[in-house]
Amino acid sequence: MTETLNGTCLCGGVEYEVQDPEALGYCHCTRCQRWTGSSLAGVVVANENFRFTKGEDLVKRYESEFAPRNFCSNCGSSLYDDLGEKYFVAAGLMRDLELDPSFHLQVAYKANWHEIGGDAPQFAENPP
């Protein structure tokens, strides 16, 4: 059975759908903290399972040293990181998301005020 999640940016100008999400995880690196203002909770999805349903023309791209980061040019909402064959889609923009976190990456760089709970595996950098 195909699971479909829908998401929208803050202003509602960009809408998208994600099919068959693979995992929900957190990235605690300083780049994600600067991009979102905190650790990034994201859904991993194959890029062929992500599609815009509205406002693709509003999406702009920032080329960073790690991965291209895509955002709404109207409201500035962080949308997703382009990791090549996969996207890491900002979880906070999705309605009815019911996945449990399955990993924490870059924990060595987490903000000192961020307490990590739960039993999802934690990796100081990236998994081996």
Give residue ranges: language-model regions.
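A short Gly-Trp-Pro
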Residues: M1-T8, G13-P128
